[in-house]
Amino acid sequence: MHRVLFLYVRRSSMIYDLSHTIAAIATATGESGVGIIRISGTEAYNIGEKIFRSKGKTRFKDFKDRTIHFGTIVDEKGREIDEALVLIMKRPHSYTAEDVLEIQCHGGRQSVSDILKLVLRSGARLARAGEFTQRAFMNGRIDLVQAEAVMDVIQAKSSKGLSTALSQLEGRLSGIVADMRTELTDFITRLEVTVDYPEEDLEDIVVHDLEKTMRCMMKRMEQMLKDSSKGRIIRDGMTVAIAGAPNAGKSSLLNYLLAEDRAIVTDIPGTTRDALEEWVSIQGIPFRLVDTAGIRETTDTVEAIGVTKARNYIETADTVLILKDRTQPFSDEDKALIKSVPDGKGAIVLTKSDLKPLLECRDLEVYGLPVFSLSSKTGDGINLLEEYLVSRSGESGTGENEVLLSNMRHIELMRQSLNALKRAEETMYVGMPTDLILVDLREAWELLGAVTGETVQDDMVGEIFSRFCLGK
């Protein structure tokens, strides 16, 4: 149990100085309606008292928690910089669990910049990227899963991605991991008792109970890892390469799916010479659509580079849509393109269904790929293609309340923890000493702790928060 306690308190003993008061601009750079400067730390209110003059009768030091006050920001010589609202959030009831002061001023570049400079001159230092969230983690208000979910909320590319991130921010994944660690802690403790007091003859009973619990835990881990592909797509999106010969309708399809004229469409073959990437949300799933250059033999140097890039996207994309103008005969080049698509990734899309066809869907079923017919002019058939893309993401089988692994760090740690449990199971099966079972159980316990940050290394924490934006 000493080891458990030591690892639990590691988070608050990491090499990180919480004594400094930090400040940063929390809104995007540029002109806007409102600009926000966030201050956190022991000197936050002393700084506020120096620079804020309230329009009300209450003195700054008498401001109550979770209140808003209107006034002006003044510099060291009493000169007014801007009108502002200040928000008071006293520890531990704030984002960082420290005293926090937020200044809301007009969103001009100069006003926000001048106020931040004044705050820094008054005793704060400029916050590093992600440092406010890092303090929330260090002060125990959130765990590492929740901290990473903050950035996922900000970067969500779709409604499903936002929902998954909010679920993790609320602590649902953390709760599952915590329950697993609690069960492992219980059995580690009970097994240690059998080692320390062998005369009690409890080992067979404890090992039998452990086997049943481990099987249930491993089954749940395996299911979560299986479903993690859905989580990854919801978080990071699915890449869809739109490929085909020149004038097959690739750019027209991209424009229809985006509901805007993003790509240039002409009757001139080779108009698209480089890959054009855009994000679109279909039924809440983020898709990264790549309109590639038309694939053909060419002596044009620039177009040839585009064709090479198109072939690279065909190799690496999650899904490849092979577009074919159904008013044109099927060629050897079309056959070669279909064969170049990795197994299980391709679908054939016959375009220009509003025109008199030379090809029917049944003509191409011999290639063993899904075949769709559509018109980017009328929209006919595109809903079926969208349903196909959603089904490719795996989202069609996801329950509303399902907790998904979406972060690669979490997925890898869960996989390693599962492997440690499998080794423990094998050790029990062959009748090895209890001490060896404990080695694998402790490793599984520690790896799960790294998910939530209880046993994570200091350098990993720093690396995670360095990905955040300033002011968060």
Please name every model-derived segment.
Residues 305-326:
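Inter-motif core of Ras-like GTPase G domains
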